[in-house]
Amino acid sequence: ESALAQHQTGRNSGVVHAGLYYPPGSLKARMAVAGAQSMYAYARAKGIAYDNCGKLVVACDESELPGLDRLAERAEANGVPARLLDPAAAREIEPYVRCVRALHVETTGIIDYPAVCRALADDIGAQGGEIRLGVGVASAESTPHGVEVHTTTGETLRADALVACAGLYADRVALACGLEPDARIVPFRGEYFELAPEKNYLVRNLIYPVPDPRFPFLGVHLTRMVHGGIHAGPNAVLALRREGYTWRDVDVAELRESLAWPGLWALAKRNIVPGAREVVRSLSKRQFAASLSRLVPGIEAADLRPAAAGVRAQALRRDGSMVEDFLVQTQGRQVHVLNAPSPAATAALEIADHLADSVEQVLAS
């Protein structure tokens, strides 16, 4: 990479997640709940822009009430402060929202994640570390005394241990380092729009739908960005390359690699209808706007301006099941992060502590 935060860190909703959605006891649940607080504390210490503004998850009709109730129960199980609201109470928080009931999640917020990344880079430099931009990993191997990493620039780097957090290339790096992960990264693009400034008054903070239980993403939502403006999205469509930020970004070899993984076909078979809906929404701004207007009436296609898309690095097993939790695998003195989609940005400092513990364990073994 030529710079920091070029992919998932710099191309997301900028949301600090409260830990609402994840199974109790999972790494995602525990690390998001703790991570939100540690991320806010880090931002305060470093002078990074953030706002613990809260969010609404809204049930737009009666059919979504059971799903909203399940989220409220999960919030309680995970220790997330949240309360159910009737429509009048919801409109005190978001005056233009349309709902039959809403869940107000107090510890959700927004933050400048690229600024967090730059601050962490400064911390690394202050402690004598070095970030080697423009250098790729060709392979790595364990040795009697640690690990040797061979780079694309012809260097061999030696260390006591290796921690690999390769995002969209996590599985490739693991394979190049001699591991055999039982899941593969399949890239899903999330497309965003920015609301026209004259319509920003429609959204105060964050408005989310009740997730469709048939599809493993949260649905398009409305998010106030920490430096201003309202972003809408993301949807979720298969990217045609790992860094496929538009439909024009195609890499035949990478696409063939995705299509060759049996898990993708199994996932597609189970999600034909919602998957097709996502593709239509990707190709039609009118359909995208229609999804948003369920949450906030008055948003039209003409109000949406294209914004930078992101690609989610999602690990997918051979049977088509998505790896739902964070996944870390160790081998010898290597520690590989094989699945870290949302809420990994929120949980970044907690994940770092977890990885530091893993390194201590492999060095002691």
Predicted regions and their residues:
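Helical element adjacent to the flavin cofactor pocket in flavoenzyme catalytic cores
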Residues: 103-161, 165-172, 347-360
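Flavin-dependent oxidoreductases
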Residues: 140-251
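Glycine-rich FAD pyrophosphate-binding loop
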Residues: 1-11
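Short beta-strand to alpha-helix junction loop
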Residues: 23-34, 58-67, 103-123, 132, ...
